[in-house]
Amino acid sequence: VSFLLNGPDGQSVPVSLPVPGLHNARNAACAAVIALLAGAEPAAVTEALSRFSGVARRFEHRGKKAGVHFVDDYAHLPTEVAATISAAKSGNWNRLVAVFQPHRYSRTEALWRSFGNAFSEADLLYVTDVYPSGEAPRPGVSGQLIVDAVKADCPGLEVRYVQRRTDLVATLGNELADGDCCLTMGAGDLTTVPDEVQMLLSDNNE
């Protein structure tokens, strides 16, 4: 993502980041302003930002296999999910296949309605069951709540509920195609899925 940072003196500083997303642009703009106010040279600021590769589990590129790009992100709240999907949508791929694992029963119960529009820019959405993170199950609280919210708010988006995480890798292996981006999101144990799917695709292509 690239943008111009306009200073109070009328000077424009071009900034280019190797990571996508409006949220990254905003963070970079804040960092650049602070650095410039502290006396840093504009060239040094733009050079430093041009080498920023992101942090672990924040739009982290996990590889490419059989023409499928794999990206993993820690996003687990509605606003984070929407920002991450918006960033991913700017990529040059055929389909954006989002995979979301709700985090904690208490959070899912409180926020499930807010997820309805968060996935609107995806082409296909998979939702797993809730990652408990030490919490006990709650009656009526599952990943199905997220599915219901998305179907209500985004009727044109195809959403599939894969209740058991153990079924997810095989499901993705059968669905993903050349030119797709598989974006996994959540604060649970979904982070290993990109590696597992790539191993499956490697085995299938041998």
What feature does the model see in each segment?
Residues 3, 7-124:
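Nucleotide phosphate-binding/pyrophosphate-handling subdomain across enzymes
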Residues 13, 106, 135, 192-193:
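Glycine/Thr-rich phosphate-binding loops of Rossmann-like dinucleotide-binding domains
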Residues 83, 110-112, 138-139, 173-174, ...:
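Short amphipathic alpha-helical segments
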Residues 98-100, 127, 161, 184:
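Structural beta-sheet core signal
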Residues 102-105, 130-133, 187-190:
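Short glycine-rich anion-binding loops that position phosphate/pyrophosphate groups of nucleotides
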Residues 116-178:
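C-terminal helical cap/extension that packs against the catalytic core
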Residues 142-150, 196-206:
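A short, gly/pro- and small-residue-rich
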Residues 167-198:
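A glycine-rich beta-strand to alpha-helix segment
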